[in-house]
């Protein structure tokens, strides 16, 4: 399976701290989005599956599978927290409280994570 960017390019960019997405395309006539997700996620706690809406005949349908995040943002009540140390495993003690309203802190994270 060919991935984009290539593994070496991805690793170089990752080491410099640039946000990026690793992706591939595949014909999925024998696989559903959910079955692919279940195989790839393998019960990982912080995994996600996002699908495009139906009716995307012109541009096709898209599935995004997220695995092993490097940042986790969560909110309990109106207290936002962030964990930037997830690659070695997720521990509650690694979450830091963000002293901003929850929506503002999430907006800041979106801006910080922007991929050109």
Could you describe each region identified by the protein language model?
Residues 1-116:
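Signature of the chorismate-utilizing enzyme
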